Amino acid sequence: MPNTDVSSLSMLGQQTETAQSPEQAVLEKVPSNHAGTDYVVRFTAPEFTSLCPMTGQPDFAHIVIDYIPGEWLVESKSLKLFLHSFRNHGAFHEDCSIYIAKRIVELLDPKWLRIGAYWYPRGGIPIDVFWQTGKPPEGVWLPEQGVATYRGRG
């Protein structure tokens, strides 16, 4: 029988406030009922927002997170609120992208994780950030992230 114990979760099914910073945001996990099976979980945040640490202007990204769970899954509402906590947070693109991935890795200890952060241009230059924990296990179906390279008017 699947493990559906959610008693340790503090946000799911509750009214919650958005944390004012990523450091304050709570990420929660739930047990995986298929820990012995290698499969990919994908989260896509096509409207991720943070602030430029120098100008305070908004920065926007399309973020794709793929991971192969071990014993745990990230609870999706907590992930949504964690990502939303960057809205008023000033940090460079690279820092936001890697921080997100490392927080998830710290929480879950997944078998594998990758992040693709496709940032929209500021100052005329798009910045894309890619990171993964290592090679994915053999035989896992790993779709492309499907985000087109920024072309502007080209």
From Swiss-Prot:
Belongs to the GTP cyclohydrolase I family. QueF type 1 subfamily. Pathway: tRNA modification; tRNA-queuosine biosynthesis. It is an enzyme of class 1 (oxidoreductase). The active site is at C52, D59. Its main location: cytoplasm. The gene is queF. GO terms for molecular function: preQ1 synthase activity. Residues 1-23 have a biased composition (Polar residues). Keywords: Cytoplasm, NADP, Oxidoreductase, Queuosine biosynthesis. It comes from Rhizobium leguminosarum bv. trifolii (strain WSM2304). It is found in: Cytoplasm. NCBIfam families: QueF-II (TIGR03139). It holds the Pfam family QueF. Gene3D superfamilies: 3.30.1130.10. Substrate binds at V74, E75, S76, H93, E94. This is NADPH-dependent 7-cyano-7-deazaguanine reductase. Residues 1-26 are annotated as: Disordered.
